[in-house]
Each structure stands twice: as C-alpha cells, then as structure tokens.
C-alpha cells in the first residue's frame, strides 16, 4: 500500500507530465511523432486508394482502359515500403542523436523525482498508519451493531440507524482531517517540484526542436547526409512511377482518338 501511496502522491504533486518517467517510457521525439503521422496517413491513403480503384475498374470506362491499377498500386506500395525501409537507418541515427543529447536532462529529472519520493515517504507512512488505525477503530465499534443485525425488526432498524449515523459521520470527519493534514504536509514540496519538472521538460522540448546552435549544426549535417543518401532512393521511386504514368497517358490518348473517330 505504501508504494501505491508514494506513486499517487508524486503524480499528485507533479501532474501527468511525470507519467512517462514512472512507466520507464522513452519520451517521444518530434521525429517519432512525424513518422507515426506519416505511417497513419500512408495506410489511410492506401486503403482509400484501393476502394477508389476497385470502383473505377468495375466501371465501363475502367474496363475499356484496362489499366490494371490495382496491380500497379501494389507495385507502387511495395516501392514506397522499400523507400521507407531504406530510410529507417537514417531516421534511427537522428533519433539516437536526440536521445543522447537529452539523456542528462532526463536523468536529472528522474533524480529530482526520486528525491521527492524519499522526502514525502514519512508523511505517507504516517498517513497510512493513521488511516489503518481509524478504520480498525470503526470496525471494532461496529462489531456489536453487526451482532444485532441477526435479529432485526423495524423498530430496531430505526434504532440502529440512529446509532450508526453519528459513528459514520465521526469516522468520515476524522478521515477527512487525515487527508487534509497530508495535503498540508505535501504542499511545500508541490511548488518546488512542479517548477523543477516544468523546467526540465521545457529543456527537453527545446532539445527536441533544433534551436541551439550546436544542435542545429548537428541536425543540418545529418539532414545533408540524409538528403545525399536519399536522392538515389527517391530517383529510383520516380523511375518506378514513370512507366505507370506514361501507360495511363497513352491509354487515355488512345481512348480519345477512338471517341473522335466514332463521332466523325
């Protein structure tokens, strides 16, 4: 129970911002968010594209053109997947650089939170002991009443209600006092910890967006290398796409010529 109280108390002091540190999650970098959004977008476009292609190919014009767009889409999807796979090492390189630059800040923040846990532990132990004592006293006071429940009449129910009400109200008030006392004991740590947490998280966010000159230089260098390595990959993708575009253009031209001959 004490471990649960410690965790809840720290989350109460710091807010949900500290969640990733207690769960030992790596903070999501801007690159992570961009990649996740890109993956979702590509999957959505792919699913929507298949539906549209299926409807088009089943139409009269689609059957006449016989473009086999579904097959071409699968080929293009494979090419796009290959491009994304080839980009993965470069993405990891930039991500690892960001994590390395923010490692010290994240370690400092974890240390601050651990120090606060140790400082508030005595208050939580005291709160837990008092709470347990109050509940036990309440249980003992109710034991005779529970015995009377075995033989109830309407009159006895009303009498028992009169007995229980003041006891329940007294216990409720005492437990509220314990919670209020705990809140007052933790209050001095709340402002300091929130300020430290906000400061550290702000520094991490700033590291995630290349603003410092040193970090800017690193990112520019990495992006320059990435652009050089990606150029042939993008060119290969464009070359894969060109035949399908030319095929579509030629078939449309043939269809227009056929329509003109029919109308002549």
Curated annotation (Swiss-Prot):
Participates in the reverse transport of cholesterol from tissues to the liver for excretion by promoting cholesterol efflux from tissues and by acting as a cofactor for the lecithin cholesterol acyltransferase (LCAT). Major protein of VLDL, HDL, LDL and in chylomicrons. Expressed in a number of tissues including liver, small intestine, lung, kidney, heart and muscle with highest expression in liver and small intestine. InterPro entries: ApoA_E, Apolipoprotein_A1/A4/E. Keywords: Cholesterol metabolism, HDL, Lipid metabolism, Lipid transport, Repeat, Secreted, Signal, Steroid metabolism, Sterol metabolism, Transport. This is Apolipoprotein A-I. Residues 1-18 form the signal peptide. It comes from the Eukaryota. Its main location: secreted. Sequence repeats lie at residues 67-88, 89-110, 111-121, 122-143, 144-165, 166-187, 188-209, 210-231, 232-242, 243-264. One of its GO terms (biological process) is negative regulation of interleukin-1 beta production. Belongs to the apolipoprotein A1/A4/E family. It is found in: Secreted. GO terms for cellular component: chylomicron; endocytic vesicle; extracellular vesicle; low-density lipoprotein particle; spherical high-density lipoprotein particle; very-low-density lipoprotein particle. Coiled coil: none annotated. It holds the Pfam family Apolipoprotein. One of its GO terms (molecular function) is enzyme binding. The keyword Zinc-finger does not apply. Residues 67-264 are annotated as: 10 X approximate tandem repeats.
